[in-house]
Amino acid sequence: MKIAVIVFPGSNCDIDLYEALKTVCGADVDYVDHQQTSLAGYDAVMLPGGFSYGDYLRAGAIARFAKIMPEVKRLADEGKPVFGTCNGFQILTEAGLLPGALKKNDSQNFVCKTTPLEVVNNQTIFTSQYQEHERINLPIAHADGSYFADQATLDELEANHQVVFRYAEENPNGSLNNIAGICNRAGNVLGMMPHPERAVEAILGNTDGLRVFKSLLENGTVIAEG
């Protein structure tokens, strides 16, 4: 299984994703520049956090037009795993790969802390090694992390079990339904505001994010070989 970590101008969590996959999990992973036009040979795509294109217009609004994005959409349409954390989640919504939008935090402040989450759906490519309703703690660091969608979309997300992670105990940004992460109908595209890649080593004090990547590698390998 070969994984691409897309690098946009202003990305700053691409190294974190790469190290979590390569160094910690031993995965076959490459950095791929946003100006590339092919993802041939890759079995999964990761969109990192950061401030792509300086967050001008809106977070993720310009990145959706990057030359690499048609290939990201192609892999998603083919059922291959596509993952976005923080700014990557924002890009996925702007690109139409996930429903809804991320708006400014209700506090109007940048929030940076570790926050409790509930694993709502453990039947996805990315969460199969968690227990349903398991409580975990992951770092967040964002100013535009408040998930918004109209009521019909929210109802559909809930009915189809597309809410994958939910904020537990407190809502740090005003996200509707306490949503921290969602997937598409097929379950192969996941976006989340928390940063699992920052919680993969005991030396950092937290390994709650490690199973996102172990789940991806376990299930993605089956998809790639199938």
From Swiss-Prot:
EC identifiers of the protein: 6.3.5.3, 3.5.1.2
Occurrences of domain Glutamine amidotransferase type-1 (ranges): 2-226
Subcellular location: Cytoplasm
Residues annotated as the enzyme's active site: 86, 195, 197
Main subcellular location of this protein, as a coarse class: cytoplasm
Reaction catalysed by this enzyme: N(2)-formyl-N(1)-(5-phospho-beta-D-ribosyl)glycinamide + L-glutamine + ATP + H2O = 2-formamido-N(1)-(5-O-phospho-beta-D-ribosyl)acetamidine + L-glutamate + ADP + phosphate + H(+); L-glutamine + H2O = L-glutamate + NH4(+)
Pathway linked to the protein: Purine metabolism; IMP biosynthesis via de novo pathway; 5-amino-1-(5-phospho-D-ribosyl)imidazole from N(2)-formyl-N(1)-(5-phospho-D-ribosyl)glycinamide: step 1/2
Gene3D superfamilies: 3.40.50.880
GO MF, any single term: phosphoribosylformylglycinamidine synthase activity
Assembly with partners or alone: Part of the FGAM synthase complex composed of 1 PurL, 1 PurQ and 2 PurS subunits.
Function (record text): Part of the phosphoribosylformylglycinamidine synthase complex involved in the purines biosynthetic pathway. Catalyzes the ATP-dependent conversion of formylglycinamide ribonucleotide (FGAR) and glutamine to yield formylglycinamidine ribonucleotide (FGAM) and glutamate. The FGAM synthase complex is composed of three subunits. PurQ produces an ammonia molecule by converting glutamine to glutamate. PurL transfers the ammonia molecule to FGAR to form FGAM in an ATP-dependent manner.
HAMAP family per record: PurQ (MF_00421)
Protein name: Phosphoribosylformylglycinamidine synthase subunit PurQ
Biological source species: Limosilactobacillus fermentum (strain NBRC 3956 / LMG 18251) (Lactobacillus fermentum)
